[in-house]
Amino acid sequence: GIFSLVKGAAKLAGKGLAKEGGKFGLELIACKIAKQC
């Protein structure tokens, strides 16, 4: 459901932020949430 999606997004955000830096990680999460990849 919604909560598992949010948890997954948070995990991806954490990894993305750590690995790629803020902007890329946030854009990836926004893309996943909006389903407009």
From Swiss-Prot:
Tissue expression summary: Expressed by the skin glands.
InterPro entries per UniProt: Antimicrobial_frog_2 (IPR012521)
Disulphide connectivity of cysteines: C31-C37
Keywords in alphabetical order: Amphibian defense peptide, Antibiotic, Antimicrobial, Cytolysis, Disulfide bond, Hemolysis, Secreted
Main localization, broad class: secreted
Subcellular location: Secreted
GO biological process: defense response to bacterium; killing of cells of another organism
GO cellular component entries: extracellular region
Primary role: Shows antibacterial activity against representative Gram-negative and Gram-positive bacterial species, and hemolytic activity.
Family per similarity comment: Belongs to the frog skin active peptide (FSAP) family. Esculentin subfamily.
Protein name per its UniProtKB record: Esculentin-2B
Organism: Pelophylax lessonae (Pool frog)
Organism phylogeny: Eukaryota, Metazoa, Chordata, Craniata, Vertebrata
